C-alpha cells in the first residue's frame, strides 16, 4: 500500500515528472535517498508505470483535438481497436462502457484533415458503425 508520503510523491511527479528528488525530499522533510527508494518501490509495484510529457498540439500544427467515440459491431471491437492503435493521429485510445465502445483522442491539422480522418480512415475500418467526434475547445486541467 501507499502511505501519505507516497501520495505526495505521486502528486508532485504527476504534475512535473522532472521534479528533482532533492526538492521532493525538502517538501517531505526526508532524505533524497529515502525519496529515491520510495519512487523505486512505487515503480516496482507498478503504481508508477512510466514518465511522460505534455505536448501542445497547436505548436506542432494541430489546430483541432477531439475526443472521438467509435462504435463497432461487437465481434469486431478488438480488431477495430488494434487498427486504431496503428494511426499516428490517434494519440490516446480507450475501451469504454459509456456512450461509445471506444474513445480516441485525435489530433487533426484542421477541419478538412479531421473530416478525412473520420470519413476515409476511421469510417472505412471494417466493423466501425459510428464515429462521433467532439472538438475540445479548451483544456482546463
Swiss-Prot record:
Locate the HTH asnC-type domain: which residues?
2-63
Xref: InterPro entries: ArsR-like_HTH, AsnC-type_HTH_dom, Dimeric_a/b-barrel, HTH-LrpA_regulator, HTH-Siroheme_Decarb, Tscrpt_reg_AsnC-like, Tscrpt_reg_AsnC/Lrp_C, Tscrpt_reg_HTH_AsnC-type_CS
Gene3D superfamilies from the UniProt entry: 3.30.70.920, Winged helix-like DNA-binding domain superfamily/Winged helix DNA-binding domain
**What keywords are assigned to this protein?**
DNA-binding, Repressor, Transcription, Transcription regulation
Quick check: keyword Repressor in the entry? yes
Can you provide one Gene Ontology molecular function annotated for this UniProt record?
sequence-specific DNA binding
PROSITE patterns, A to Z: HTH_ASNC_1, HTH_ASNC_2
The residues that make up the annotated DNA-binding region are 21-40
**Pfam families referenced in this protein's UniProt entry, alphabetically:** AsnC_trans_reg, HTH_24
For whether the record's keyword set contains Nucleus, the answer is no
Superkingdom classification of source: Archaea
* CDD domains noted in UniProt: HTH_ARSR (cd00090)
Q: How does it assemble?
A: Homooctamer; tetramer of dimers.
Which function does this protein serve?
DNA-binding protein that negatively regulates its own transcription. Interferes with RNA polymerase (RNAP) recruitment by inhibiting the association of RNAP with the TBP-TFB promoter complex.
The protein depicted here goes by the name HTH-type transcriptional regulator LrpA
Look up and give the organism this protein is from.
Pyrococcus abyssi (strain GE5 / Orsay)
Gene name for this UniProt entry: lrpA
Amino acid at each position: 500500500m501507499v502511505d501519505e508520503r507516497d501520495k505526495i510523491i505521486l502528486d508532485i511527479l504527476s504534475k512535473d515528472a522532472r521534479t528533482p528528488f532533492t526538492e521532493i525530499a525538502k517538501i517531505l522533510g526526508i532524505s533524497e535517498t529515502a525519496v529515491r527508494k520510495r519512487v523505486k518501490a512505487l515503480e516496482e509495484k507498478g503504481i508508477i508505470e512510466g514518465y511522460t510529457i505534455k505536448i501542445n498540439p497547436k505548436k506542432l500544427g494541430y489546430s483541432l483535438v477531439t475526443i472521438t467515440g467509435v462504435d463497432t459491431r461487437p465481434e469486431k471491437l478488438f480488431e477495430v481497436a488494434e487498427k486504431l492503435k496503428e494511426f499516428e493521429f490517434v494519440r490516446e485510445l480507450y475501451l469504454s462502457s459509456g456512450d461509445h465502445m471506444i474513445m480516441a483522442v485525435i489530433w487533426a491539422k484542421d477541419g478538412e484533415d479531421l473530416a478525412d480522418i473520420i470519413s476515409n480512415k476511421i469510417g472505412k475500418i471494417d466493423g466501425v458503425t459510428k464515429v462521433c467526434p467532439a472538438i475540445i475547445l479548451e483544456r482546463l486541467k
